[in-house]
């Protein structure tokens, strides 16, 4: 499986690997698969388990390795495991985390329209 994702180390070092597979059907299956993946990762985080979603670089090889038959297809590979060092998400601001990940700052891609009142 590691040879079929963009970051093989995230799979090789994982204690558990989950491959989310979808079947065509009604609704937004890719959207639902993303929500399922996010739910698994958030549940793991709540229990002290880290995770890393991986994009699939060779879908055909992954399908062969796992005997996934069309029309089913894998959409994401998630590695789960124990943190390699203590977690401290508050050691950086959201802006610092975004910069470290080489992502655009939120204020450059988010537009706030009006005020939200609760």
Please give the residue ranges for each predicted region.
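Acidic, surface-exposed loops and disordered segments
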Residues: 1-118
């Amino acid at each position: 499986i590691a040879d079929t994702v963009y970051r093989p180390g995230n799979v090789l070092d994982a204690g558990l690997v989950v491959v989310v597979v979808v079947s065509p059907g009604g609704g937004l299956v890719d959207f639902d698969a993303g929500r399922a993946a996010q739910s698994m990762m958030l549940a793991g985080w709540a229990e002290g388990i880290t995770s890393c979603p991986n994009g699939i670089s060779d879908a055909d090889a992954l399908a062969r390795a796992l005997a996934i038959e069309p029309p089913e297809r894998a959409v994401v590979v998630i590695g789960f495991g124990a943190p390699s060092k203590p977690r401290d998400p508050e050691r950086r601001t959201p802006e610092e985390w975004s910069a470290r990940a080489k992502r655009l700052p939120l204020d450059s891609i988010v537009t706030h329209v009006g005020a939200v009142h609760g």
